[in-house]
Amino acid sequence: MTVGYGRELLDLIVAGTPSGETPVRHICDIPARNAEVAVWPQWVHRDAITAFAAQGVTDPWSHQVAAASLAFAGRHVVVATGTASGKSVAYQLPILTALAAEPRARALYLAPTKALGHDQLRSIRELITGIDSFDRVLPCAYDGDSSNELRRFARESSRWIFTNPDMMHVSLLHNHTRWSAFLRGLRYLVVDECHYYRGVFGSNVALVLQRLLRLCARYGSHPTVVFASATTSNPGAAAHALIGQPVEEVIADGSPHGMRTVALWEPPLLPITGENGAPVRRPVSTEASRLLADLVQEGARTLTFVRSRRGAEMTALGAAHRLAEVDPALASQVAAYRAGYLPEDRRALEQALSTGTLTGAATTNALELGVDIAGLDAVVVAGFPGTVASFWQQAGRSGRRGQGSLVVLVARDDPLDTYLVHHPGALLDKPIEAVVIDPTNPHVLRPHLLCAATELPLTEDDVRSLDAADVVAQLVDDGLLRKRPGGYFAAPGLNPYAAVDIRGSIGGQVMILEADTGRVLGTVDSGRAPATVHPGAVYLHSGETYLVDSLDFGDGIALVHNATPDYSTFARSTIDIAITGEGERIDLGDIQIGLVPVSYTH
């Protein structure tokens, strides 16, 4: 395979288009980049160097050493470099050195998804297995999939815990006295994929992190925070907003990558018209299925990113059908990966993707984050993912080091995607967006203040650092906080933890059960259940088709049975917005702009 392998793959899929179609609107080649290597710092424990050498890492890259050295010196740092640039080494070096040298030292790793946390845990176990200096590290997962026995082991024995913001909030912070030994020895806190923490989710995570650091100070530890981020605008400021403390940034990427070919692809018009006679293009899911099938048939390891769980299932199913027409054995080389699968099913798919047992997968943004899937040849992005940062994060999953790769953005039939493929500079030359959070939002801050006061009375310094004086005063007026000489105390009997909705989710989980066997297929958020598992709905799961028999919100169960209907179902959404008052209005030529009250019916 040559440096121009991405171009070869593009020529292949273009050759597979029907005669007369010219879907490629723009092609851009991103040049290859050579590695910038560094030497191992003198402070790194010799067994850590041995461990990395056994994994084939003989010379670290410059950004890894720069970030690791800042962390070892006790300075909070964010390393913001490209996908697959080895950011994990930047925190593994100081952590392993501390764990080997200090028996009481502890480390905490925080990931936004369980898949990423388990992937990093697997990587660490492979790295340190068989090395005596690390035999008492006992790295362990602590998340919603962990059994009670494993949770107790993590709390009492593990020196490096892999968790997520949700578990940190509901368990570690809530029951911090049971974690006192761990918190007292906490030397390093890793916040991986920190660019993911934006909006309300990021604001909640910021307050969780600041509550953690507040408790650590109470127990006498002052952990160094190491952030790992995709390339973003002003990563140091974003990391500062998460913990409320200054953060150094390392942004010069020393990792190598091969030439990457980016193609902007517009599906052709169909000989039909839509609403009001509007032209209609071939659906993005159909186009993405064909591209995935063509690439897998060529042997190119491919990820196709889609916008929805149903889209992942449909794209994988469509690709499998196309491949089966060529060679039935190829159909098993593609699968869907999405949220809602059982933990063991997710782990099996991750392993198959990592080892190459699966050649292609259709996925939601669940695989946008840094799960280690090395050696991908191509990425198909089925529809603009909403931000430039997400596009480059998904695109960055492609490319073996030193070899070319292909990225194809397939435009959906909507104005934004159409504009982007016809104006490539609006995507390819646009700066990556800044991460925006607001931990001082009173609706977010209020329940966190109650949790913090439950954990440890709030001092005046705490109130000032959180910019929370007005919210605290309101909580005192409401009788939820009580002011005493020692600070602000939570009212007796108060349990505010359930009021914190970290991810802005919509209700609990509905289990999807096969009626004939009782087998659990997966789960769906109760807010999504009426649209996806209503009675009579066609439900897709891992390439199998089911019909929904019943949906019971009381028990949180949807019953389904295996079937092969010759139709599919989807939810229709009707929205009615009506202006109900005069408000403020101005005329701009033929257009009127107004700030007016409305009624919203959905």
PLM region descriptions:
Residues 404-407, 413-428, 445-460, 474, ...:
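Extended Lys/Arg-rich polyanion-binding regions
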Residues 332, 339-341, 359, 365-406, ...:
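Conserved RecA-like helicase motor core of SF1/SF2 enzymes
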Residues 196-254:
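Post-DEXD/H (motif II) to motif III coupling segment of the RecA-like Helicase ATP-binding lobe
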Residues 144-185:
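Conserved helix/coil segment N-terminal to the catalytic DExD/H
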Residues 113-117, 292-322:
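Conserved strand-helix element at the start of the C-terminal RecA-like helicase core
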Residues 97-117, 220-221:
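Conserved SF1/SF2 helicase motif Ia
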Residues 236, 240-241, 248-305:
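Conserved interdomain linker/interface between the two RecA-like ATPase lobes of SF2 helicase motors
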Residues 1-62:
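Helicase-associated low-complexity/disordered flanking segments
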